């Protein structure tokens, strides 16, 4: 009937010098796998009244719940620090470039839910700006997520929260949330917080928090511009 639709999503990539693989002392022209890899490869079935089901490789329900950001600068500045230079190593202070062996990816983690994987996912219809999601991921992982987006008198608001259980594969569970608001004059404020319980070790929970102040404007007739400043902290990574 008119309420039903079905389709497939196929998204492949050929990475060359991926931002999370580059190093300061890299001595090769490129870092690449010399092959295509899958990002998304799934079937989906959608009903206007019942929601949407996905089968295959793509984002789990909680993927991205730490990244609500209305600043317009997310492509280069986001809570996912490890994806923007995660292999860059810190240097020993006062040395001639001696590496500590500790990288950005070792110290910073947004704990951004379960990522892309083979899964079954369900998204509810959107009610009053709210959408609920859940997925079961290969390896008996599972998660829950909620997302909300509305506009109030010219102010945009976006919220997301998630819980994930990766106990069978990574011996951890976690939860996180993010929020972003953008005023009609272009200034935005975004924030996120997450915590993961590492079950296999007797240590404190990993915690992450992040804040960003942004502003977008039209500097020239060529189009819009956006700037932002952000700060984050990861504990017990």
Where are these regions (language model features)?
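Detector for outer-membrane/organellar transmembrane beta-barrel domains
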Residues: 144-237
